[in-house]
Regions:
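Hydrophobic ligand-binding cavity/cleft-lining segments
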Residues: 2-12, 16-133, 230-235
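Beta-strand/loop substructures that line and gate deep hydrophobic ligand-binding cavities in soluble
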Residues: 5-22, 54-55, 159-219, 223-227
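Intrinsic-disorder/low-complexity, polar/charged segments enriched in Ser/Thr/Lys/Arg/Asp/Glu/Gln
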Residues: 69-75, 151, 172, 184-188
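Short, surface-exposed coil-to-beta transition loops
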Residues: 71-73, 137-139, 168-174
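A short, structured loop/turn motif at beta-sheet edges
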Residues: 79-83, 144-151, 176-186, 226-234
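Short, well-structured alpha-helical interface segments that form or flank functional binding sites
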Residues: 80, 84-87, 138, 172, ...
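Beta-strand residues in well-ordered beta-sheet regions across diverse protein folds
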Residues: 86, 155, 188-190
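Acidic, glycine-rich loop-and-strand cores that form catalytic or ligand-binding grooves
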Residues: 124, 129-157, 161, 166
Length: 235
């Protein structure tokens, strides 16, 4: 496990207060609309931005869960080279560059995150087995697979998961960068969660609610990474 500070270094550029507030208001509006419409809109938003080939492909991180799982695939085109996108993506995590999503909403639910808008050299190296923190009071999530410049997959394989973890469904959460040409790339987010028909009603409700919230936060994360990479690549 990597040693990680829970506060970013003093020399980095943080997200402006104005942008944080503006995006926070946007996030509240998006969250309300998505939650109210999720029974209908889920069909289209579950795989937001992904094409059929991306939805139907088998990705490396899929191997971190049992074969009986459900998938979510989301994607976005980015007008920047893959290496530029990677330099932002690899900084993901609490105490690092943040989650690139709605900082105000994250703070409202008790996550004191700081979203960073600059490349920090000390955050550019990760390895399989390193853990990324999502909340200062929660265990980190391990990196199960990683290929520098191409993908990072969070989760543990069924073979290495400990007995205590077996009581909860296995899950993998992965991001892939595919170059389209020298100046454009595609960022793909893939989530797999083990599913059982024996899930209780409360577990199914929690999964349903969690799916809506995941969409709200993940679409903003993808859009923020696009903005940062395109701004960086234009310099």
């Amino acid at each position: 496990m990597s040693n990680q500070r829970l506060e970013p270094p003093d020399h980095i550029r943080r997200r402006s207060i104005l942008r944080c507030l503006f995006e926070g208001v946007e996030g509240l509006g998006v969250a309300v609309c998505v939650l109210l419409s999720w029974p209908v809109s889920r069909k289209w938003l579950k795989d937001w931005g992904a094409i059929q080939a991306e939805r139907e492909s088998t990705w490396p991180g899929d191997s971190l869960v049992d074969s009986n799982h459900k998938t979510v695939t989301r994607a976005i085109d980015i007008g920047a080279p893959a290496e530029v996108v990677w330099s932002w993506l690899v900084q993901f995590g609490f105490g690092r560059a943040g989650f690139y999503s709605y900082e105000l909403l994250e703070r409202l639910v008790g996550i004191p995150v700081v979203n960073v808008e600059s490349i920090v050299p000390e955050w550019q190296l990760l390895s399989v087995g390193d853990e990324i923190v999502l909340h200062p009071k929660s265990p980190g999530i391990p990196i199960g697979l990683l290929k520098s410049g191409e993908y990072i997959c969070f989760g543990e394989s069924p073979e290495t998961r400990d007995a205590a973890s077996e009581e909860t469904p296995g899950r993998s959460w992965s991001m892939y960068i595919e170059p389209k040409n020298a100046s454009k790339s595609r960022l793909i987010l893939r989530s797999c969660i083990e599913y059982s028909e024996e899930m209780s009603s409360s577990e199914k409700l929690a999964s349903w609610f969690g799916g809506a919230i995941d969409f709200v936060m993940e679409q903003r994360m993808l859009r923020t990474l696009k903005r940062l990479a395109e701004s960086d690549g234009a310099h």
